Amino acid sequence: MTVKLVRMWSGEDVIADIVEDTSDSIIITDPIVAVPSPQQGNIAFAPWSPLLQKDKIEITKKYVVYIGDPQEEIIEQYKSMFGKISTPTKKLIL
């Protein structure tokens, strides 16, 4: 999982897993944006483009200002939201 912050020309900071990075575009999955929380000083996360049906979104790089690493706390929160939970294939006998 490659969690990055993507700053769009529109001013949005999108946090997503970048699954492919080419010279012309990036392909992301599970994109979210930070939104103000009712509690002062806190933020919450909301889906970016929640009406899309696709699992992967291709973004042309001409609409991207920069791509960077989010703060470690943001990465951990993202991974807890979208990380795959692996379960053992065999049952343990206790």
Range-by-range predicted roles:
Residues 1-94:
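Conserved RNA-binding domains used in RNP assembly and mRNA/RNA metabolism
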